[in-house]
C-alpha cells in the first residue's frame, strides 16, 4: 500500500503566519490537494484535529483520521509526531508526507522512473542555500540545537536548503528517518522560542545521517512559490 499523507490542524497557532489559528472546514484549504489525489486515484490520508463529520462526508475517496490537538508542541513540530504515529500504526510500502493547502500532486510519485527504495525524496527552495534563510537561521537561538555536533556549521553553510513540505520514500528508508527526526524534535524543541525547529533539524539530519541517500528538487517538486502549472514534476508546491 502506498500513501500520500497530510494534516489539517486548527487547535494550535501557526507560528509561520503570525500565530493565527486556521479555520476548520475550509474547503479552499484542502481543495487543490484533494482534487489532485482523486484525479490520480491515490490513497490520500488527512490527519485532523477538529473537522466536522459534515465536512468530511462531502470529501469521499480519501481517509480522514482524528488526532489530538498539538497541546504543548509547536504546530509544525507536532506534525512530525503525527507522521511518526501514522507509520507505526499502518502498514505501507511507500509514503509521501506533504503540506496541504499549497501542494498539488501532479504525478503518482511511486511509479516514476527516478523513484527507488533506497532514496529519501524531498523538495528544495529553488536552489537556495541554508545560509541566510529566516527559519533556518532562527534555530541559532535554540541553545539545545546549537549543542549538536556540527549543527551551526551545517545550517549556516552554502549547502542546498531542503524543503520538508514534500518528503517521501519507501518503508525501508523513511521509517527510520521519521523516527529519528521525531525523536530529535522532541528532544530539541523549545516552546519559549517563537519559531519551529523542524526545518533546521530536517536539514541537519539529512546532511549528517543521510547525505548519500537523498534527492531534492525537480522532478520531485516545482519551483517553490512560483505557482507553476506544469506536468513534468511529481508535486507543485505553491
Language-model-detected regions and their locations in the chain:
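Short catalytic/ligand-binding loop motif for oxyanion handling, primarily in non-cytosolic enzymes
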Residues: 12-15, 53-56, 103-107, 112-114, ...
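Short amphipathic alpha-helical face segments that pack within enzyme cores
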Residues: 32, 82, 104, 200-201
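Viral RNA-dependent RNA polymerase
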Residues: 34, 57-59, 66-68, 92-100, ...
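GT-A fold catalytic core of metal-dependent nucleotide-sugar glycosyltransferases
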Residues: 80-136
